[in-house]
Design a protein with these regions (language model features):
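Hydrophobic, well-ordered secondary-structure elements that form the walls
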Residues: 97, 115, 132
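C-terminal hydrophobic helical "lid"/dimerization subdomain
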Residues: 116-129
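Rossmann-like dinucleotide-binding domain that binds NAD(P)(H)
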Residues: 1-26, 113
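C-terminal glycine/acidic-rich active-site capping loop/insertion
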Residues: 1-9, 36-109, 145
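C-terminal capping/lid region of NAD(P)-dependent oxidoreductase domains
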Residues: 127-145
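Short glycine/proline-enriched turns and hinge-like loops at secondary-structure junctions
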Residues: 25-27, 43-44
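Short linear motifs in exposed loops
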Residues: 16, 42-43, 138-139
Length: 145
């Protein structure tokens, strides 16, 4: 499936997903391109974030390097050079829930509103596919301005 979407401030995104991409086993990549550069992260190299500034040299940012944000260090559970995987990502959410229950909120938890937006996006993708790929509004009515 190919999903095109618009976010706030005119940002355009594209999501491609397939369960039958020949030669890829659980491949999951995220790429972000903007006016000043681009980032790429791939599940096959989970400890690296590739950053390329416009007009500059590509840089590989490794897990555990000095200068990373506190959340990047806090959410890393295993030693450098060892991938963490999906189960530990979910465990981080559980830890954030426990912190929230103790009153140590970081505003990192998903909200009911973000869940509703996610469900609306899936429903819009299905409706668009049934309509031959027509552009479909994915914003729930209560969030429309």
């Amino acid at each position: 499936a190919m999903v095109n979407f618009r976010m706030s401030k005119g940002i355009v995104g594209r999501l491609w997903t397939s369960s039958v991409a020949i030669g890829r086993q659980h491949g999951f990549d995220i790429q972000v391109f903007g006016e000043t550069g681009g980032f790429r992260w791939a599940s096959e190299q989970p400890n690296q974030l590739i950053y390329t500034p416009v007009g500059g040299r590509t840089q590989i940012i490794e897990k555990g390097e000095a200068g990373l944000y506190e959340d990047a260090r806090r959410l890393s559970r295993v030693a450098i050079a060892h991938p963490e995987g999906f189960p530990l990502a979910v465990a981080n959410i559980y830890c954030d829930i426990a912190d929230s229950i103790r009153g140590e909120t970081r505003d990192a938890l998903p909200t009911a509103a973000s869940g509703l937006r996610s469900i609306a996006a899936v429903h819009a993708a299905v409706a668009s596919a049934k309509a031959g790929g027509a552009w479909t509004n994915a914003v729930p009515p209560m969030f429309r301005s």
